[in-house]
Amino acid sequence: MLAAGMQPAEAKTEDGKWLIYLSLSYSGNSWQSEAANIVKALAKTPPYNDTVELVEVISGTDPQSQISDYESMIANGADGIVSFPISSNALNRTVRHGCEQGVLFFMYDATVTEQCAYNVSYITSGFGENTAQALVNELGGEGKIFLSRGVPGNSVDERHTNGAMHIFNQYPGIEIAAEYYSNWDDRTTQQETSKALAAHPDVDGIWAQAGEYGAIQALLQADENRLVPMTGENSNGFRLALANEEYQAKGLSGVSAGSPPAQSGLAFKLMMEMLEGERDELPEDQRNIQYPLPWVTADDVKLCEGDTFEDGCNTFPGDKVPSSFVTEVFNPELLPELSLASALEGTPTPGATIQPLPADVIENAPNEPGINCRNCDAPENLYELTTVEPTVSP
């Protein structure tokens, strides 16, 4: 039974299924594969396996290519598009056109500033500033550091770096010796970090986005007995390294935070609940939805014995998943349908059925000009620390 005021939309395929597009831009790393697999697994989970036709489209890193693909999806009668957008601004006109045609746009992780789209993202939860402060704390406020960034021009990379620089600029003793784009990929991060180490072998710390395990490999390749404090994202290899006593003795310390692939699953389920009339659509000025920031120190690393996050575990044994596997694929409260095979292969969990999201699942994200809104004012406490406290004064 539908709640009062909720009316289901009408599916557009000939067989009565919802036509849903999974639109990727950059797709060259484990995170992107896992996020896409989560959506695929959910779409194959009853009852969606009988009601959803899911079509995956990979556009690449050229905004014009994703614009063209969006236009084709709209023309083909899409009911919904769940997407990792390549640009926060370049896609806006096409997104608005799609909204006017009745298409629901749900962006995950990366964001757009067209307010008719839903942005489901941890981007505003403070990764950049909190991890930067954690690194400053580890270094005692002084030292040479590298910045290992993501994909040029993407809103996620820009927001992370802006937040980090807000902190680093407060500490005159912090010197940014090298800054490079690593495309959120272990191999590229290792290559770019190795280049930076050739020029600055005395680096004291590394602030990294996804691909951080590659930075550890570059450090060990340069000097097998020397590691440095690092902050990074959620790769399984990085979490295992943080908890490795041998690596700690060589100098490794830090925190694992960053982007959960599970954001894609929340975006997909929210979109489906709205299409099915189980949840009201939100006013356009309330469509920025915040996903919480994971935060795991060496002391917090706990190995999982099974194929899901249970009993507070957050990392898998090294012989179970690749080092590049992004751990934050599960959310037992929001995505109980998923298992390890869902993230690795896009397959549904045997016996699982789609469970409704909690009624109060939506947490409004703050507006950030150029990131998730246009013609809006940023909050005064935009880069306020929310997870870590300074232990050294600027």
Predicted regions and their residues:
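Hinge/cleft segment of the Venus flytrap/periplasmic-binding protein
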Residues: 2-17, 268-394
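Extracytoplasmic "Venus flytrap"
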Residues: 5-6, 15-47, 53-67, 84-88, ...
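Hydrophobic alpha-helical segments within soluble ligand-binding/sensing domains
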Residues: 5-6, 66, 120-145, 159, ...
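Structural recognition of the beta-strand scaffold that forms the well-ordered cores
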Residues: 20-24, 32, 55-56, 80-84, ...
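An alpha-beta-alpha
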Residues: 20-29, 33-41, 129-179, 271-308
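Short beta-strand elements at the ligand-binding edges of bilobed clamshell
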Residues: 58, 112-137, 147-152, 179, ...
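Hydrophobic alpha-helical
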Residues: 71, 75, 79-100, 164, ...
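Flexible loop/hinge segments that line or gate small-molecule binding clefts
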Residues: 88-126, 144, 237-241
